[in-house]
Amino acid sequence: VELISDLKEALQNRGILFTMMMFFLIQVCVMLLQPLITMYVGQLMGKVDDEAVQMAGVIFSLAGISGILAAPFWGNRGQRYGYVRTFCYITLGAGVVNLFQFFTTDVYQFAIVQFIFGLFLAGAIPNINANLAEVTDKSIRGKAFGLVTSAQMSGGFVGPLLGGALGHVLPTRLVIICAGIILIGVSAFTYFTKVKGK
């Protein structure tokens, strides 16, 4: 009941609603690859065995490793140039980099693209969180952060389900670049709507 009440309140605040949508979509993009990466790495290596499984784990972690390095940089850029503006650049860059995965021909190229993808995507969460803090009143800030966390968790389970479903009907390579297309769409939506708050 409380969740429904909170959602009704969120629908009246464009800033909270925008942030929930962005958290959801970004998490979907991150998790879309999860059910497919081992098989895809195996295809690139020409075999699906223990080595491919281990390599898939390493590659999936690369975005997180690069994120550790890049997140402070993007946070500073957001504080200096504006969180929404920086978020547009981040999602556009991540989307374009992700599209390059279509052209990878071996596992090492795929790993490099994943690492660069993480360098961009690392700045998304800090900047939309900072923007959320700016556009919400202190009285509802805790509630707002709770809602966007729920949206992020929703993306966390929708992403793998969607990736697995798409993997049944599309080549893995095309499923992967779907994330890039979504991120470019997020960037364009953010740029043209310039959502900041109420």
Q: Whereabouts are the PLM-identified features?
A:
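Helix-to-loop junctions at the C-terminal end of transmembrane segments
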Residues: 69-82, 167
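Juxtamembrane intracellular "pre-TM" segments in multi-pass secondary transporters
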Residues: 1-20
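A membrane-interface helix-boundary motif in multi-pass transporters
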Residues: 165-183
